[in-house]
C-alpha cells in the first residue's frame, strides 16, 4: 500500500501525461481509437473524465463527460480514418458491426471496472474501521500445496535415491518400500490429478508414505535392541531427507513459519493489497480512494458508519411505508422482516457504541473485541439522555520546553539564573542552573490539566547574593494560554520585566505543546449565538467532545475552568454552510447547526477553519446530507503554487483530486442505494478465485483475513446469512464440478446453515425466508446431491489414497444430510443405503473400466494376441485388480465403515467385471495346460485372506472354474508318476543319487512337488481341499509301496548274482537299495500322513511295509554272509579227523619235513574271511544312511555267524579239531568278535551263550593241541594279547 501522506502530485502528473498522450493519439488517428489504445485508456486512465475527441470509448463512463463527447457514431465510422486511405475491410457494414461489438465489450469492461471500484470502496471501509468482526485465530492452518513442477522435482529426487545418486544410506527393506511408494503413489495419474486440483500438500505425501510403510515394518522380524517404532522413525527421517533434497532445512523451516504467520493475521496494509489483487484495483486508484475516503481518520470512518446505519433505518421505514417487501414464503413474515432490519441495525449501533474512542494509529485489528452485551440503542429516546457538564471533562497533557533567554545585560556573567514553570493550579517545576553569560537549558516540563484554556506561567530568576536575602530575585515572567491548535515549535516571547530589573528587553524562547485528547475532535475560537444556549453574539473557545460513538457535544470553555461554561448536545442537529448574517459583526465565515425548534449560528475567522469545523460537526451529527462549501477557494494548481496557497483543508484537496480522476462518484455514493447482495456475491466469488489460486492447499477455505473482511462486509451492509452461504455453496460447487478439490466439511457447514434457515430454525436469528432463498436452496441441494453421488462413484479419483484426510467420510456424512427432507427427521437408513449402493455399483464399473484401459495402454494393443499372451495380460490385470482392492481397503474402508457390506458388494461387482475378461482368457487356452494355475494362486491367496471376500461370489466362481483343472492335473500327474516308476526301475542302475537312486529321487521329488503345489493352492473350500489331500496321500502311499516292492525284488536279484566266496564285496547298489528304503520311510512321513488324528492309515500302512521289507532285505543279506561263512567252514571240514584228505595231508607233511623245510598250513582262509567281513562292514557303515538298520544288520549278522560256527563245532563234538581247523577258527572268531565290537555291537549281543560255547570249545581244543603238538599253535590263542593285536594290525 502507498503511504497516504506521500506526494500525490507526481502520480497526478503521470496521469495527466497519459491522458494527454491518449487524446493526442486519438486526434492523430482521425478521432478513432484503436483497440490497443482503448484498452490503455480503460486500464490506465479510465474514470478521469476525459474530454478529448475520442475519450468516450475508452474512459467515457468514468468521468461522466466522455460518453457524451466521444461516444457519438461519427467517431466510429470507417470513413473517418485519417489520410482517406482504402478501408481495410471490403464491407463497411461488417466493420461497423465489429466496432459495435468492440464498443459493447469496452462498455461492459468499463461497467465492470466501475462496479469493482465501488465495491473496493466498501471493502476499504470495512478494513479501515471494523466494528463487528475480527480475524479468527482458531482456524486450521492450511498447508502449502504442491505444484506440477514441485511434484516433478520430488519424483526426480526419489528416482535419484533409487538410482543410488544420493548420500542417504538405506537397507534393502527401505529401498523396496521407497520403490513401491514411487511406483504406486508418485507416478500415479490420480496424484497428478490431485496436484492439478490444488488439493495435494507435502503432508499428504508424507502421510501416505507413513501408512504405506507401517504394515511393512510391522511384518519385519523382531531384532533385539531395535523396536519397530525406532525403525519407523528412522525411515520417516530418511523419507524427509529424500523429499527435501539438497535444500537447507533451516530455510525451509523459516519459509514455513513465515507462510504460517501470513495465514493467521494480516495487517491493514496487507488486507488492502490483497483486495486490490482480488478486485483488480491499481495502486494509484487505491491511493486516490484511500486519501479521499480519509481511511486513516477513525472519526470520519465512525461518522460514515453512523450515516450508513441511519440510512438503513430510513430504508426500513421506507420499505414498511411503501410495502416493497421481498417475496417471502409466508405473508406474515413481512412485519417480521422490518423488525429484523431494525434489530440488525440496532445491534450494529451497539457494536459501534462499544468501540473505544481512539486515534487511528493506536487501533489494532487483532485487538478488536465485539460487545454482545452492549445495550441496544433506541433512537427514539436519545433526546431524553441529556449530558451534564461533568460528562464532558477533558484531560490535557502539556509539554513546556524552555530553550534560552536573551537580554540579560546587567547581570554579571557568572551570576546564576534559572526558570520556573507552572500550569495554573498545578505543581511548579524548575530548570537547571545556568550562568547569565549563557542562559540556555532545553529543559522540558510535563503537566496534565483538565482546563481547556490553561494558563502557563514561566518566570526567570537569579540567585540573590545578599546575606539577608530569603528569596531569589525574579527578573521577568511570561503567561501563555495555549490551545491544542497552538504552534508546536519553539518561539520567542517578550517577558514582563520586574520593577527593579534594569534589563527591560528580556525575551525567552520556549515551546508549549498541548496534546489533543482522544475524545476531543476539534477546538478553536468561534463567534456564536443561539436560542437556548450562547444567547449573546460573542467569541468563545469551543471544543467538540465525543462522549461515545453516538454522543457528541459542542462545549464552550473559559480560561482556567475544567467544566464547560455551556454545552450543546448535537443529537438530531444538521450542520451546513450559511451566508453571512446581517447585524452580526465579528467572524468572516458562517455556518449553522439546525434542529427542529432551534438554530445555532457559528462564525470563524477564515474559510479553512470553517471547513474543518463543518467537517467535524458533520461527522458528529451523523446526518445524511453532506455539506458542500459555497465557494472552494482551493483549486488544483501547478506544483509550484500548490504549496503556497492552502486555504482549504487537505481532505478537501484529496476530494478534489479524486473528483478530477472520476473517483468522487464512488466515494460520495450512498451505500444504502446499492444491491449489496449482488455486490457481496461478486466479491466473495472473486475472493474464492484468488484463494484457490494462491500457494496454499485451502480446499475452498478462506484465509482468516478474507473471512474477517467478508464477515465485516455482511454485517455492515446487511447481507443475509442464507444468501451468503447459498452464493458460497454455488461457487464451491462450480469449482468442484470443474475438478477443484473442495473440502466436504466446508460444504456441510454452509449447507447445514442454509437448511436450518430455510426450515425456520434461525441459525443467525433471522426468521424470514424469501421465496428466492428457498428456490435457490432446492436447486443447490439437487446440484450438491448430484456432485456428492458423483464423488462417491469416483471415490478413488476424487479422494486418491484417502486424501484429503477424512474427506470421503465427510462426503458420506454430507450426502446423508442432503438426503434429509428436513433438518429434524433423519433419513431412513435403507434409503441412504440404496443411494450409496447405486454409487458403488457405478464405481465398480468406472474403476474397472479405467483399470482395464490402463492395462491395455501398457500392453501395446495392436500386437497379435496369443493365448499365452492373453493369459499373461490377465495375470497382470489380476495384479492390478488386487492392488485396487487393497488400496480400497487401506485408504477408503474406514470411511465406509458404516457401509462395510456395501463395500463388499462393490468389491464383488468389481471382481465380477474382471471375471468376464478372466473367463474369456481361460477359454482360449489349449487343453491340458497348466499355465493358468498362477492366476488362481494369485487371486486365491488374496481372497482367502480377506474375511469379506473369502468364499464370496467371485471366489466360488474361481473355485468352480479351476476345480476340474486341478482334478485333471492330479489324474495326469498320477499316471505320469506311475509310468516313470515302471520305466525307471526297468532301467535303474542303482547308482547313488542324493539319498537314494535316480528313480526314487525322481519319484519323491514329483510327489513332494505335486503335494506342495496343491498345498500352495490353499483351496478355500474345506471339503474339496480335504478330498485333494486324501487323494494325494493315497497316491503317495501307492507310489511308495510300488517303489519299495520293486526295490525289494531288485535287491534279491542282485544278491543272487553275487559271489558266494570270501571274494564277495558288498556292492554299491545294495547300499543304494537300503538307502531307498531309508528315504522311503522318511518321505512317507511327509507324503503319506494326514493332519487329522483319525487319518494315519496311509502312513502306518506304508511304514509297516517298509519295515517288513527292510527286515527281509537284512535277512537276505545276512543269509548271503552266512552262506559265505558256511563255504569257509566247508573247506575246514576237509581236515576233520578220519577223513582221507586229513590222513594224506598229515603223511605228506611229515615225510617231506625230513628233507626240506615244508611250510605248515597257513591262515589264508581265515584272513580272507576276516577281510571279507571287515570290508563288508566298512562299506555298509559308510554307504547306508540309516544307523538303526546298520545296527540291526550287524546284530543279526553276528548272531547268525556265531550260530553257524557253533553248529559246526557241535557237529564235531566227538572229534578233535585238526590243528589247522583250530587255528583258523580261533582267528576267525576272535577277529569277528573284535570287529563287531568296534562297529558298535553291544556287549550283551557279543557275549551271547553261543559265543561262550564257541570260546570254551576252542579254549579246550587249544589246550589239547598244545599238549599233543610239540610246536603248539605258533602263537595263536583264544587269549587276548597286545602282540597279537599288533600282529593283526
UniProtKB/Swiss-Prot annotation:
Compositional bias per record (Acidic residues), positions renumbered to this chain: 1-19
Tissue-specific expression: Specifically expressed in neural and endocrine secretory tissues. Expressed in brain, pancreas, hypothalamus, pituitary and adrenal but not in heart, placenta, lung, liver, skeletal muscle or kidney. In brain, it is absent from the cell body layers of the hippocampus and dentate gyrus but abundant in the synaptic neuropil, except for the stratum lucidum and stratum lacunosum moleculare where it is not detected. In the cerebellum, it is mainly detected in the glomeruli of the granule cell layer where it colocalized with synaptophysin.
Residue stretches of biased makeup (Gly residues): 44-75
Biological processes, Gene Ontology terms: catecholamine secretion; establishment of localization in cell; exocytosis; positive regulation of calcium ion-dependent exocytosis; positive regulation of exocytosis; presynaptic dense core vesicle exocytosis; protein transport; regulated exocytosis
InterPro entries for the chain: C2_dom, CAPS, MUN_dom, Munc13_1, PH-like_dom_sf, PH_domain
Subunit structure: Interacts with the dopamine receptor DRD2. Interacts with RASL10B. Homodimer.
Location of region: Disordered: 1-107, 1264-1289
Record function comment: Calcium-binding protein involved in exocytosis of vesicles filled with neurotransmitters and neuropeptides. Probably acts upstream of fusion in the biogenesis or maintenance of mature secretory vesicles. Regulates catecholamine loading of DCVs. May specifically mediate the Ca(2+)-dependent exocytosis of large dense-core vesicles (DCVs) and other dense-core vesicles by acting as a PtdIns(4,5)P2-binding protein that acts at prefusion step following ATP-dependent priming and participates in DCVs-membrane fusion.
Name of protein: Calcium-dependent secretion activator 1
UniProt KW keywords: Calcium, Cytoplasmic vesicle, Exocytosis, Lipid-binding, Membrane, Metal-binding, Phosphoprotein, Protein transport, Synapse, Transport
Amino acid at each position: 500500500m502507498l503511504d497516504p501522506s506521500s506526494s500525490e502530485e507526481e502520480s497526478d502528473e503521470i496521469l495527466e501525461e497519459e491522458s494527454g498522450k491518449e487524446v493526442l493519439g486519438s486526434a492523430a488517428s482521425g478521432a478513432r481509437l484503436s483497440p490497443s489504445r482503448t484498452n490503455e485508456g480503460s486500464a490506465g486512465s479510465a474514470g478521469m473524465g476525459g474530454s478529448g475527441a475520442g475519450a468516450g470509448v475508452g474512459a467515457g463512463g468514468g468521468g461522466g463527460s466522455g460518453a457524451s463527447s466521444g461516444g457519438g457514431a461519427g467517431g466510429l465510422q470507417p470513413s473517418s480514418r485519417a489520410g482517406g486511405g482504402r478501408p481495410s475491410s471490403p464491407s463497411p457494414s461488417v466493420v461497423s458491426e465489429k466496432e459495435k461489438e468492440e464498443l459493447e465489450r469496452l462498455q461492459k469492461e468499463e461497467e465492470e471496472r466501475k462496479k469493482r471500484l465501488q465495491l473496493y470502496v466498501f471493502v476499504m471501509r470495512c478494513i479501515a474501521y471494523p466494528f463487528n468482526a475480527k480475524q479468527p485465530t482458531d482456524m486450521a492452518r492450511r498447508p502449502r500445496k504442491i505444484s506440477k513442477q514441485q511434484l516433478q522435482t520430488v519424483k526426480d529426487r526419489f528416482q535419484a535415491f533409487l538410482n543410488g545418486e544420493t548420500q542417504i544410506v538405506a537397507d534393502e527393506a527401505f529401498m523396496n518400500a521407497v520403490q513401491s511408494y514411487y511406483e504406486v503413489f508418485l507416478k500415479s495419474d490420480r496424484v497428478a490429478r490431485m496436484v492439478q486440483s490444488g488439493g495435494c500438500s507435502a503432508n499428504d505425501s508424507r502421510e501416505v508414505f507413513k501408512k504405506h510403510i507401517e504394515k511393512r515394518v510391522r511384518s519385519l522380524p523382531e531384532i533385539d535392541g531395535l523396536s519397530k517404532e525406532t525403525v519407523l522413525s528412522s525411515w520417516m527421517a530418511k523419507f524427509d531427507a529424500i523429499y527435501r533434497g539438497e535444500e537447507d532445512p533451516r530455510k525451509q523451516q523459516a519459509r514455513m513459519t513465515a507462510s504460517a504467520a501470513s495465514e493467521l493475521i494480516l495487517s491493514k496494509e496487507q488486507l488492502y493489497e490483497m483486495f486490490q489483487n482480488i478486485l483488480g484495483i491499481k495502486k494509484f486508484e487505491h491511493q486516490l480512494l484511500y486519501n479521499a475516503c480519509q481511511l486513516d481518520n477513525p472519526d470520519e470512518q465512525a461518522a460514515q458508519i453512523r450515516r450508513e446505519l441511519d440510512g438503513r433505518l430510513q430504508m426500513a421505514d421506507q420499505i414498511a411505508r411503501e410495502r416493497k417487501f421481498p417475496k417471502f414464503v409466508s405473508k406474515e413474515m413481512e412485519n417480521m422482516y422490518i423488525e429484523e432490519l431494525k434489530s440488525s441495525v440496532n445491534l450494529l449501533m451497539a457494536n459501534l457504541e462499544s468501540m473505544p474512542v481512539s486515534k487511528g494509529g493506536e487501533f489494532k485489528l487483532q485487538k478488536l473485541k465485539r460487545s454482545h452485551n452492549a445495550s441496544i440503542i433506541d433512537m427514539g429516546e436519545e433526546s431524553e439522555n441529556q449530558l451534564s457538564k461533568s460528562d464532558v471533562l477533558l484531560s490535557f497533557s502539556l509539554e513546556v520546553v524552555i530553550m534560552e533567554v536573551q537580554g540579560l545585560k546587567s547581570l554579571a556573567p557568572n551570576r546564576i539564573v534559572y526558570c520556573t514553570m507552572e500550569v495554573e493550579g498545578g505543581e511548579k517545576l524548575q530548570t537547571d542552573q545556568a550562568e547569565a553569560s549563557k542562559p540556555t537549558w532545553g529543559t522540558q516540563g510535563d503537566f496534565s490539566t483538565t482546563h481547556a484554556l490553561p494558563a502557563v506561567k514561566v518566570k526567570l530568576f537569579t540567585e540573590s547574593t545578599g546575606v539577608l536575602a530569603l528569596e531569589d530575585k525574579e527578573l521577568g515572567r511570561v503567561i501563555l494560554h495555549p490551545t491544542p491548535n497552538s504552534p508546536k515549535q519553539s518561539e520567542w516571547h517578550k517577558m514582563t520585566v520586574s520593577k527593579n530589573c534594569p534589563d527591560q528587553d528580556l525575551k525567552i524562547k520556549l515551546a508549549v505543546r498541548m496534546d489533543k485528547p482522544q475524545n476531543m475532535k476539534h477546538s478553536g475560537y468561534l463567534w456564536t449565538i443561539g436560542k437556548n444556549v450562547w444567547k449573546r453574539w460573542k467569541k468563545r473557545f469551543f471544543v467538540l467532545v465525543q462522549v461515545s460513538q453516538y454522543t457528541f457535544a459542542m462545549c464552550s470553555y473559559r480560561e482556567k475552568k475544567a467544566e464547560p461554561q455551556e454545552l450543546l448536545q448535537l443529537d438530531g442537529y444538521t450542520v451546513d454552510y450559511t451566508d453571512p448574517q446581517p447585524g452580526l459583526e465579528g467572524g468572516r465565515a458562517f455556518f449553522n447547526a439546525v434542529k427542529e425548534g432551534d438554530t445555532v449560528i457559528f462564525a470563524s475567522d477564515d474559510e479553512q477553519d470553517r471547513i474543518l469545523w463543518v467537517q467535524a460537526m458533520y461527522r458528529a451529527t451523523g446526518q445524511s446530507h453532506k455539506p458542500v462549501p459555497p465557494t472552494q477557494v482551493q483549486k488544483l494548481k501547478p506544483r509550484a503554487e500548490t504549496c503556497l496557497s492552502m486555504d482549504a483543508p487537505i481532505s478537501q484537496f484529496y476530494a478534489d483530486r479524486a473528483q478530477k480522476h472520476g473517483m468522487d462518484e464512488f466515494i460520495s455514493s450512498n451505500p444504502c442505494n446499492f444491491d449489496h447482495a449482488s455486490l457481496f456475491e461478486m466479491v466473495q466469488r472473486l475472493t474464492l478465485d484468488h484463494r484457490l489460486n494462491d500457494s496454499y492447499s485451502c480446499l475452498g477455505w478462506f484465509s482468516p483475513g478474507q473471512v474477517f473482511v467478508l464477515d465485516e462486509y455482511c454485517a455492515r451492509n446487511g447481507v443475509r446469512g442464507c444468501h451468503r452461504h447459498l452464493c458460497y455453496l454455488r461457487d464451491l460447487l462450480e469449482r468442484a464440478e470443474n475438478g477443484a478439490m473442495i473440502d466436504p466439511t466446508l460444504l456441510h457447514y454452509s449447507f447445514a446453515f442454509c437448511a436450518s434457515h430455510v426450515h425456520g430454525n434461525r441459525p443467525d436469528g433471522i426468521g424470514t425466508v424469501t421465496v428466492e432463498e428457498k428456490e435457490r436452496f432446492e436447486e443447490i441441494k439437487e446440484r450438491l446431491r448430484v456432485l456428492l453421488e458423483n464423488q462417491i462413484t469416483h471415490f478413488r479419483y476424487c479422494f486418491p489414497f484417502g486424501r484429503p484426510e477424512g474427506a470421503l467420510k465427510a462426503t458420506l456424512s454430507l450426502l446423508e444430510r442432503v438426503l434429509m427432507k428436513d433438518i429434524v427427521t433423519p433419513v431412513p437408513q435403507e434409503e441412504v443405503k440404496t443411494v450409496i449402493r447405486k454409487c458403488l455399483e457405478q464405481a465398480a464399473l468406472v474403476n474397472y473400466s479405467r483399470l482395464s484401459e490402463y492395462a491395455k495402454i501398457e500392453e501395446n494393443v495392436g500386437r497379435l494376441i496369443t493365448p499365452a499372451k492373453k493369459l499373461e495380460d490377465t495375470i497382470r490385470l489380476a495384479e492390478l485388480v488386487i492392488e485396487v482392492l487393497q488400496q480400497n481397503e487401506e485408504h477408503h474402508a474406514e470411511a465406509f465403515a458404516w457401509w462395510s457390506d456395501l463395500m463388499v458388494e462393490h468389491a464383488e461387482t468389481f471382481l465380477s467385471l474382471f471375471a468376464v475378461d478372466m473367463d474369456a482368457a481361460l477359454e482360449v487356452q489349449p487343453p491340458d495346460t497348466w499355465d493358468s494355475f498362477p492366476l488362481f494362486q494369485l487371486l486365491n491367496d488374496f481372497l482367502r485372506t480377506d474375511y469379506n471376500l473369502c468364499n464370496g461370489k467371485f471366489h466360488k466362481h474361481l473355485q468352480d472354474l479351476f476345480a476340474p483343472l486341478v482334478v485333471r492335473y492330479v489324474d495326469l500327474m498320477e499316471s505320469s508318476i506311475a509310468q516313470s516308476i515302471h520305466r525307471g526301475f526297468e532301467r535303474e542302475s542303482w547308482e547313488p543319487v542324493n539319498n537314494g537312486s535316480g528313480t526314487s529321487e525322481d519319484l519323491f521329488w514329483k510327489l513332494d512337488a505335486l503335494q506342495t503345489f496343491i498345498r500352495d493352492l490353499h483351496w478355500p473350500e474345506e471339503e474339496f481341499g480335504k478330498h485333494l489331500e486324501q487323494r494325494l496321500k493315497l497316491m503317495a502311499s501307492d507310489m511308495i509301496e510300488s517303489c519299495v516292492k520293486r526295490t525289494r525284488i531288485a535287491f534279491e536279484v542282485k544278491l543272487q548274482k553275487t559271489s558266494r566266496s570270501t571274494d564277495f564285496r558288498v556292492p554299491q547298489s545294495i547300499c543304494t537299495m537300503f538307502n531307498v528304503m531309508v528315504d522311503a520311510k522318511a518321505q512317507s512321513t511327509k507324503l503319506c500322513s494326514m493332519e487329522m488324528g483319525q487319518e494315519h492309515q496311509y502312513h502306518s500302512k506304508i511304514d509297516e511295509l517298509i519295515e517288513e521289507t527292510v527286515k527281509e532285505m537284512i535277512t537276505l543279506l545276512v543269509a548271503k554272509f552266512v552262506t559265505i561263512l558256511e563255504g569257509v567252514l566247508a573247506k575246514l571240514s576237509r581236515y576233520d579227523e578220519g577223513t582221507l584228505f586229513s590222513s594224506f595231508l598229515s603223511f605228506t607233511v611229515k615225510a617231506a619235513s625230513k628233507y626240506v623245510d615244508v611250510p605248515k598250513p597257513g591262515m589264508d582262509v581265515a584272513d580272507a574271511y576276516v577281510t571279507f567281513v571287515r570290508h563288508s562292514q566298512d562299506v555298509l557303515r559308510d554307504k547306508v544312511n540309516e544307523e538303526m538298520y546298520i545296527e540291526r544288520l550287524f546284530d543279526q549278522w553276528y548272531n547268525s555267524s556265531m550260530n553257524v560256527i557253533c553248529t559246526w563245532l557241535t557237529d564235531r563234538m566227538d572229534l578233535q579239531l585238526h590243528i589247522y581247523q583250530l587255528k583258523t577258527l580261533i582267528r576267525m572268531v576272535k577277529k569277528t568278535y573284535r570287529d563287531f565290537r568296534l562297529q558298535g555291537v553291544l556287549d550283551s549281543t557279543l557275549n551271547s551263550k553261543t559265543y561262550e560255547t564257541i570260546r570254551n570249545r576252542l579254549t579246550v581244543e587249544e589246550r589239547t593241541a598244545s599238549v599233543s603238538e610239540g610246536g603248539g599253535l605258533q602263537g595263536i590263542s583264544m587269549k587276548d594279547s597286545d602282540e597279537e593285536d599288533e600282529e593283526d594290525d
